[in-house]
Amino acid sequence: MRTMRWAGSLCGAAVCALLAAGCGNSSWHSLPAPQVTSVSVTVNPASITTAQTSQATATVEGIGNYSSAVTWTVSGTAGGTVSTTGLYTPATTGTATITATSTEDTTKSGSAQVTVTAVPATITVSPTTATIGTTQQFTATVSGLSSQAVTWSVAGPSGWTGSIGSISSTGLYMTPYPAPATVTVTATSVSNTSVSGSATVTLEAPATTTGPALTVDATDQLHAINPLIYGMNGYTITNNDVTQGNIPLVRWGGDATSRYNYQTNVTNSASDWYFENGQGSGGMPGAGNFTGFVSAVHSLGAEPLGTVPVLGWVSNSNASACSFPVATYPGQQSVDPYSGLCGNGVYPDGTNGCTSSGGCNIPGGSAEQARTSIAEPPPASSAATMPAASAATTSWAQSTWTGGWVNSLVTNASYGPASGGTGVNIWDLDNEPAWWDAVHRDVHPLPSTYDEVTYGGISTALAIKTIDPSAQVSGPVIDYWWNYFYSKQDIENGWGHGPCYQPWDDPTDREAHGGVPMIEYYLQQFAAAQTTYGMRLLDYVDIHGYDSATYNGASVGFATAGDTGEQEARINSTRALWDPTYTDPNLPQPNYLTDSNYTTSCNVPLQAPQLVPMLRKWVASDYPGTKTAIDEYNWGGLESINGALTQADVLGIFGQYGLDLGALWGAPTTSQVPGLMAFEIYRNYDGHDATFGDTALASCSGTAAASCDATGTNATAQNQLAVYGAVRSTDNALTVVVINKTYGALTSTLSLEGVTATGAAAVYQYSNANLNAIVAEASVPVTAPSGGASTISYTFPAQSITLFVVPQ
C-alpha cells in the first residue's frame, strides 16, 4: 500500500499551479520520501518433506513511492535454497527460516518458518497377478530410503493351510498348486526393517489350451503287466492300504529286517535307531513277528515277500541289547531319548580324539558284535567255497541259517511251501549290501565286495530253493546308481584316490572280476549257477530306485509337495525310469576304463538312467528269463495331488515298460490319501476292485499314430499328458489312463487304433476337486472309426488322472 499524506486539499500538479497563481501566498506541501514500514512472509505449505518445496510470499508495506522488491535468504537446520521468486527447496530435515529483506530498506525484513521432515519411506510391490504353474518376477519400488535393497516374503490368506509357493531373494515367485485365490507378497527394506510394502496377488489358472494328440494301439500288444508292480513295503502299511488299494504284494524288508532272528523274533534297528535289539520288526503287519506277517498279508489277499540275511549276522536273544551302550561309551553324539541307555555310536567333534565336524564313528568290532548279534554267515563267500552240486542236499540246506528258516515254514501246516498259497512267495537276498558297513557297521565294518554279495547270494538262494523249489528269489537288492556298477569296496577305494576321487579311480574289485559291472557280474554268476545246480536260483534282479530329482539341493523323494517348481521337478524326474533323453546331474555315466565313452576328465558326461529298460537290457544280455524288480522307491508328495499324479505316472511306466515287481517304500498314511488313490486308479477305481488292464498296449503322447510303436512317446508331450493303455483279459475292455501334469485344462483327442467300438466310455477321475475319492464322471461318446481308429475328445482338468474304460 502506498500512502501519501497532504496538509491541505489534494490536487493535481496543473491545478496547483493555477491555484498558486491566483491565490497569492497560499502554501504548497511537497511529496513524502519513500519509506518501507514492514515486510511479512507467508509460506505454503508450512510443513514439507525433503522431496517437496514450499512457496514463500512477501508482503511489503510502506509510504511514498517505495519498492516492493525483496531478497530471499534461508537459515536453520534444514538448510536448502530459496529462489528469487521465493521457492524454497530444503536440503535435509529440520526447520528452515525463510526471510524476505526489503531492497528499499534492508533493515526491514520478515520471516516464516518451514518444518522439513523426511520423505515417508514407502515400498510399492508389483504386479498384482500371477499365473498358477509359472514363475512371476516381482519388483519393489523403494522411496524415501537411500538403499533399494529389500527382502521378500509371501503369505497366504487367513485359514489357508496349503502351500503358498515360495519367493526367492530376488523376488522371483514360484506359484503353489493347489493355490489360494490370493497371496500377499511383501518386500521389506534391508536398511530399515520397519518399512515394507505389500501387494495382494491374485493367482489365476491358465487358460484351457489344446493338448498333444494321444494314441493307444489295441493291435500292438506289448507284454503282460505283472500285477506285482503295484506292491508296497510293509513298514507302516495298514490293512486299509492293502484292501482299499487292492495291493497284491507286501514286502518284509528294510534295514531292520537284515538281522532278524526267526528263532527268537528279535531284530536289530541298526543305525536307524541306536543299533538296538528289539522284539520283532516294528511297524509291520502281524505285530512284528515274521510268521504273523505272512498270515496277516495272506489274509488281506496279498503275497508276502520276505528278507533273509546275507551279511552274516543275526540278532541274538537279548531283546534289550544295543551295540554302543552309554555306560561303555559315554559322551556320544546322540542318545536314545526314551531309554537314555544307548547311543548312536558316534563321538562328537572335539571329544575322544575326534577332529571331524560331523563326528567320528566308534569302530565296530567283536565286542559290539557280541552284545547284539550272532554270526550266521551265508553258506559261501566266494566261488571256491560254493558247495558241489552233489553236496547241495536237503540236509545241507537245512543246516544253513536261511535253509533252516525256510524249512521251519515249509514244514509248518499253517504256512507250507510257496506253492501252497499260504507260504512265502518271494525272498529278498538281504537289503542294500552297499550300506552294510554304514547301517550295520557295528557288526559289518568293512565294505561289501563282489564275491561277498554274489556268492553269499547264490549260496543262500541255493538253500532256499533246495528246501522250497516253488519259492522265488530276488537279489541283489542294491540301491543307488554307483552301486549298480561297482562294489562298495570300489566306491570307497575311489573316495581315497585321485584325481577325481570317484569309483573309477581305484576299482580293484571290479578289475579282479573282469571289469564287469557289479549287477551284470551278479547276473552272469547266477546264470552259471543254474547250469551247475540244475535250477534257476534267481527269479528277479532287484534294485532300489531312489532316483527322484533334487530341488534346491534336496531330494524331492519322501518330501512334501512343495511349490510348483518342486512339483514339476518331482513329476519330471519319473523320466529317469524310461526316457533316453532324460539326464540327472547325480547320475553320470559309470566311466569304467573300458567303457566306450570313458574319459580321463573328472567332468564325466551324464547318462540317461532308463532304469527299467536298463534292467531289461542286463537281463537279456546276462541272464535271460530273469524278471525285474524295484522293491523300494519313493517320489514324495503323497499328501498332495502332485504326489498322486507322480505315483500314478510311476505305476503307468512300470506297466508300459515291462517291470515285473515294484514296491513303494513308505505306504500312504491317513494324511496321504492322494498317494493311495494313485494305486486305486489302477487297482480299485470303482470301489469294487475293478482294475486297469493286464496287457500293455503301445501308447503315445504327441506322436503320430502311424509311428507310435516305432518312435515311442514324445517326452515333452508325455510331460504334459501322459497316456497308458492296456486291455483287460477278463472282459476285453480297453482301459486308458491319462495324466494331465500341467496346471491348466487341456483338450485333446485320444485315438484308439484298431478299436471299432462306438457308444460310450466310462470315465473315472481323480483331481484336486476331491482328494478323498475317485469320481465316476459322465460317460463320453466314442466316435466311430475314421481311418482305422475310434476317437474320444475330452478336456482333461488341470492336475488330474482320468481313466477311460472302453467296452469292446
Task: Cite the ranges covered by each PLM segment.
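Extracytoplasmic soluble-region selector
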Residues: 24-206
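C-terminal motif of bacterial Sec signal peptides marking the signal peptidase cleavage site
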Residues: 20-22
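Catalytic-core region of carbohydrate-active enzymes that cleave or remodel glycosidic bonds
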Residues: 459, 463, 527-530, 599-669, ...
